[in-house]
From Swiss-Prot:
Catalysis: reaction(s): a plastoquinone + NADH + (n+1) H(+)(in) = a plastoquinol + NAD(+) + n H(+)(out); a plastoquinone + NADPH + (n+1) H(+)(in) = a plastoquinol + NADP(+) + n H(+)(out)
The EC number(s) this enzyme carries: 7.1.1.-
Classification via SUPFAM superfamilies: 4Fe-4S ferredoxins
Residues reported to bind [4Fe-4S] cluster 1: 64, 67, 70, 114
Keyword Membrane attached: yes
HAMAP family linked to this entry: NDH1_NuoI
Name listed for the protein in its UniProt record: NAD(P)H-quinone oxidoreductase subunit I
Cofactor binding note of this UniProt entry: Binds 2 [4Fe-4S] clusters per subunit.
Membrane topology: Peripheral membrane protein
Domain of life: Bacteria
Role: NDH-1 shuttles electrons from an unknown electron donor, via FMN and iron-sulfur (Fe-S) centers, to quinones in the respiratory and/or the photosynthetic chain. The immediate electron acceptor for the enzyme in this species is believed to be plastoquinone. Couples the redox reaction to proton translocation, and thus conserves the redox energy in a proton gradient.
Amino acid sequence: MFSILKQVGDYAKGTVEAAKYIGQGLSVTFDHMRRRPVTVQYPYEKLIPSERYRGRIHFEFDKCIACEVCVRVCPINLPVVDWEFNKDAKKKELKHYSIDFGVCIFCGNCVEYCPTNCLSMTEEYELAAYDRHELNYDNVALGRLPYKVTQDPMVTPLRELGYLPKGVMSPHDLPEGSQRSGKRPEEIIEEAEASS
């Protein structure tokens, strides 16, 4: 008889312990249900990185003195700095600057040791591309344009195709009443309306 009572007592203890463990597990589950979700719907929601996040490097062309400190402190000698010596000013002039973010380890040494603070880390972390060559950012992709738009070798032929006579780069240099080499869209519409 005592053996049956002992078995019933052990069964009751086991039941109480099982209920306790189930209750602990459910309390953890309900606690997590009340919390804010950890994941975000990425393309539509974006996490805000911390203040000292090391993202894509921003480069300011006008501040760079072509000292190449960034190349010397980089563990993989990554930044490509092309410069030429200006004999009149007796100093280096930067011609081209590029960084390949497919190889960069984002250590931040170049930013830390730059004497003119022309390099800085941004909070941009979306650097995905279909082709690895697209991750090679030149001075235009890293920051703002290196020269005036009127001196850009890509813009010069386009401007000559447009509305100014050949060789004239600024509309302010034209005398009043001079003919343009092309027609503006408004002029084309006016001619079409006049002929119909």
